[in-house]
């Protein structure tokens, strides 16, 4: 049962990430969508981690949804992609802002529910 909950949550999270990317990044040359979904995922996972949830609920929302929503691999490829087209400063800003905002969002989420 837990595996099915993770799969369902993952499908919903990945679909949310895909739709966010289709809508947001169609208007920008900077990886805004990946930044947004990763920070949102950190906030949600922080909220879930601080809350008293059943194992099944955490599997659905934490492991599944947040796991499908967030994407470290796309973050890495987009960072390198900016470097490849000689946009070093935007790449560095993207990396630093992503890590800082993700940590801050996770901390905030945890603080709000613990």
Swiss-Prot record:
InterPro entries per the UniProt record, alphabetical: FluC
Positions of transmembrane segments: 30-50, 57-77, 88-108
Any one biological process term the GO annotation gives: cellular detoxification of fluoride
Ways its activity is controlled: Na(+) is not transported, but it plays an essential structural role and its presence is essential for fluoride channel function.
Record membrane topology: Multi-pass membrane protein
Predominant location: membrane
Catalytic reactions of this protein: fluoride(in) = fluoride(out)
Localization: Cell membrane
Pfam family, one: CRCB
Name recorded for this polypeptide: Fluoride-specific ion channel FluC 2
Annotated source species: Rhodococcus jostii (strain RHA1)
């Amino acid at each position: 049962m837990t595996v099915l909950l993770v799969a369902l949550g993952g499908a919903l999270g990945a679909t949310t990430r895909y739709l966010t990317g289709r809508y947001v990044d169609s208007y920008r040359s900077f990886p805004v969508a990946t930044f947004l979904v990763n920070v949102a995922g950190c906030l949600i996972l922080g909220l879930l981690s601080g809350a008293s949830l059943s194992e099944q609920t955490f599997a659905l929302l934490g492991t599944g949804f947040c796991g499908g929503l967030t994407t470290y691999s796309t973050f890495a490829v987009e960072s390198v992609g900016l470097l490849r087209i000689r946009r070093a400063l935007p790449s560095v800003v993207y990396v630093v802002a992503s890590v800082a905002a993700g940590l801050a969002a996770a901390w905030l989420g945890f603080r709000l529910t613990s």
